[in-house]
């Protein structure tokens, strides 16, 4: 038995196909979803989506949103998403270094919040590449 996973951003469909299992980063921690999972709606945190497909694990960086799970259908609506295989490792590392520098020199509450958010996004992209090695 499989699940149908659909990952959507405001601009595109990132994923729409059958999967065996997922592990999703939510605001209250990670949840694993197998076929016949209980229906749930949950907030999605900035984090890694792990997808098991035909015995292999794939990863995707998710940039926050929400997910609806029910009747073996998973719909994930996020601000942005990127497959781990599509992320350029060198570019992601450079972005992380810039985000870390910006976080260190951020002044004022708003600037610190924005720098922290950019840092979390950059870390997630790097971690997505390294998650299933």
Swiss-Prot record:
Name the UniProt key words of this record, in alphabetical order.
ATP synthesis, CF(1), Chloroplast, Hydrogen ion transport, Ion transport, Membrane, Plastid, Thylakoid, Transport
Q: Which CDD domains match?
A: F1-ATPase_delta (cd12152)
What superkingdom does the record give? Eukaryota
One CC-aspect GO term: chloroplast thylakoid membrane
The protein's predominant localisation is plastid
What membrane topology term does the record carry?
Peripheral membrane protein
Tagged with keyword Thylakoid: yes
Q: Which GO molecular-function terms appear in the entry?
A: ATP binding; proton-transporting ATP synthase activity, rotational mechanism
Q: Where is it localised? A: Plastid, Chloroplast thylakoid membrane
Q: What does this protein do?
A: Produces ATP from ADP in the presence of a proton gradient across the membrane.
Provide the assembly information: F-type ATPases have 2 components, CF(1) - the catalytic core - and CF(0) - the membrane proton channel. CF(1) has five subunits: alpha(3), beta(3), gamma(1), delta(1), epsilon(1). CF(0) has three main subunits: a, b and c.
Q: Which family does it belong to?
A: Belongs to the ATPase epsilon chain family.
Q: Could you identify this protein by its name?
A: ATP synthase epsilon chain, chloroplastic
The record lists the organism as Daucus carota
